[in-house]
Amino acid sequence: MPQLVPFYFTNLLTFGMLAISMLLYLVSTIILPNILRLLVARTTMTKL
């Protein structure tokens, strides 16, 4: 199991942090604004 070998700790931590930061960036810039735009459009349509 490479997770328990100390040689792989830095590699796993580096790419883990890289993957998490890329995922967080994509979610905050692409996915959440689209969902927010959809929710605002739905609430304004129902209030009309």
UniProtKB/Swiss-Prot annotation:
It is found in: Mitochondrion membrane. It is a single-pass membrane protein. This is ATP synthase protein 8. GO terms for cellular component: mitochondrial membrane; proton-transporting ATP synthase complex. Belongs to the ATPase protein 8 family. F-type ATPases have 2 components, CF(1) - the catalytic core - and CF(0) - the membrane proton channel. It comes from Debaryomyces hansenii (strain ATCC 36239 / CBS 767 / BCRC 21394 / JCM 1990 / NBRC 0083 / IGC 2968) (Yeast). Disulfide bonds: none annotated.
